[in-house]
């Protein structure tokens, strides 16, 4: 008998983690799989950050931390927001968590009531709608296709807002598309939101430092909506620290207090040693961040070039993050042997089993006509993966 809670039965498993698990199973059987499904940098954490963590261990810095994180880390985040983003916050407006994923979930759980609507632009990160459902809210999906560079318009946002709307989740740079909102585009959205002060913005900026066409722009910069914006960020992507699990929110103090209250009952403060590592990330040299960004840009250029050479792919040109999100519906209805391709998930599984390349079908991202490829891997892997994909797709008739 299934005695799980209704809220858990409503949740869908993570498609990205499922594909990664399937890829690892094939690897364990001796199959040479190139994994383009993973959403994390392939670089190592910079040395000065690791040294800070080692020192913390040697100094026995291993006690419970305050729920929102140590003041020294929160002050480092305040300085980062001022120096890099031109935004003014205090330490009381910062709450650190076990990764940006928890920060997003904390914020949704603190804001959303049963029946509240949360606008989620599609394509979206797979966990956004599930987190809204976990909070007994209703995800309202706005779809922006490749013809819009996967970015919603002010007109679309205006139509989606109702008296039940509580929040908008906005991810820029985007996972899964790599699209980046410009200052002008954000200003257009802010103008709409200013007319609806009951709507909060959860601004996921975890890929902030991985951009290829200029400075990152935050929607929190617009005074007319600043007090309704909750920034989510962290060290995972920019500093290659996915396993250290430090994220944060920056927002109105009353929301931060609510998040602290929630987190105090769930997980308490984040890992003390990881906080020292994150402090070193924010206060130390930023040279490794730029070096990784340049490598990602080179890989972006490479994978876009190779993907455009594959007949049947419609390819976007991502301006940030480390994902390509080609449209692949021209292959739907085709087959190779007993393998039929009806949707992007079928195509992703076909590429894994026949081409031995792991990608993620777009259905769980709200875009069933696309697949996501991560180029957080070596140039050699990208070249070989795209060769395999091209050969496997050529077999479909």
Label the predicted regions.
Residues 2-4, 8, 12-14, 19, ...:
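PLP-dependent class I/II
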Residues 37-40, 55-73:
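A glycine-/small-polar-enriched, mobile loop at the entrance of the PLP active site in fold-type I
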């Amino acid at each position: 008998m299934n005695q799980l809670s209704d809220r858990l039965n409503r949740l869908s498993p993570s498609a990205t983690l499922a594909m990664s698990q399937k890829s690892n199973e094939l690897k364990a059987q001796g199959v040479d799989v190139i994994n383009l499904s993973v959403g994390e940098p392939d670089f190592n954490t910079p040395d000065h950050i690791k040294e800070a963590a080692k020192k913390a261990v040697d100094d026995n810095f291993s006690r419970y931390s305050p729920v929102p994180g140590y003041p020294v880390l929160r002050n480092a985040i305040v300085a980062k927001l001022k120096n890099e983003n031109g935004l003014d916050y205090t330490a009381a407006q910062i709450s650190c968590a076990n990764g940006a994923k928890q920060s997003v979930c904390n914020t949704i759980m603190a804001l959303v009531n049963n029946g509240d609507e949360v606008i989620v632009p599609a394509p979206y990160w797979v966990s956004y709608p599930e987190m809204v459902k976990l909070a007994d809210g209703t995800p309202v999906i706005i779809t922006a296709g490749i013809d819009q560079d996967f970015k919603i318009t002010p007109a679309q946002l205006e139509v989606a807002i109702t008296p039940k709307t509580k929040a908008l989740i906005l991810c820029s740079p985007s996972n899964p598309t790599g699209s980046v909102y410009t200052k002008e585009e954000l200003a257009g959205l802010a103008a709409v939101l200013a007319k609806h002060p009951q709507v909060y913005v959860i601004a996921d900026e975890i890929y902030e430092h991985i951009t290829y066409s200029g400075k990152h722009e935050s929607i929190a910069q617009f005074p007319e909506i600043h007090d309704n914006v909750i920034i989510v960020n962290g060290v995972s992507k920019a500093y290659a620290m996915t396993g250290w699990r430090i994220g944060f929110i920056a927002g109105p103090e009353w929301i931060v207090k609510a998040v602290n209250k929630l987190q105090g009952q769930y997980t308490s403060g984040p890992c003390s040693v990881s906080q020292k590592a994150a402090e070193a990330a924010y206060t130390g040299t930023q040279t490794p961040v730029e070096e990784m960004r340049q490598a990602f840009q080179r890989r972006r250029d490479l994978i876009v070039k190779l993907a455009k050479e594959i007949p049947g792919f419609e390819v976007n040109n991502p301006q940030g993050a480390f994902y390509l999100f080609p449209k692949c519906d021209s292959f739907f209805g085709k087959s190779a042997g007993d393998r039929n391709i009806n949707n992007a998930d079928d195509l992703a599984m076909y590429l894994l089993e026949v081409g031995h390349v792991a990608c993620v079908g777009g259905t769980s991202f709200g875009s069933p006509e696309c697949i996501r490829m991560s180029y957080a891997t070596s140039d050699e892997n990208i070249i070989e993966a795209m060769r395999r994909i091209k050969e496997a797709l050529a077999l479909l008739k």
